[in-house]
Amino acid sequence: MAEAATTDVKKLSFERALEELETIVKRLEDGKVPLEESVTIYERGEALKRRCEDLLRQAEARVDKITTDAQGAPTGTEPLDVQ
């Protein structure tokens, strides 16, 4: 964890950031971390959460739905509504 804690959050992939965030959550839930360390890893967890949210927003923006005309020919793209 020490090596991960020194890695710049902005350089982490979504999967790596999520993995580290899950580790932090487990450590905090165990309740065996000293107070000062708890605060430090909580702050890192917040940064990791923001990183994951940013990467998800970027991925959603890249997912496009192809639009077609009456004959079925592609006319362009529009944001994909997944709901």
Curated annotation (Swiss-Prot):
GO terms for cellular component: cytosol; exodeoxyribonuclease VII complex. One of its GO terms (molecular function) is exodeoxyribonuclease VII activity. Gene3D superfamilies: Exonuclease VII, small subunit (1.10.287.1040). Its EC number is 3.1.11.6. Keywords: Cytoplasm, Exonuclease, Hydrolase, Nuclease. It holds the Pfam family Exonuc_VII_S. Coiled coil: none annotated. GO terms for biological process: DNA catabolic process. InterPro entries: Exonuc_VII_S, Exonuc_VII_ssu_sf. It is found in: Cytoplasm. It comes from the Bacteria. It catalyses: Exonucleolytic cleavage in either 5'- to 3'- or 3'- to 5'-direction to yield nucleoside 5'-phosphates. HAMAP family: Exonuc_7_S. Bidirectionally degrades single-stranded DNA into large acid-insoluble oligonucleotides, which are then degraded further into small acid-soluble oligonucleotides. Belongs to the XseB family. Heterooligomer composed of large and small subunits. This is Exodeoxyribonuclease 7 small subunit.
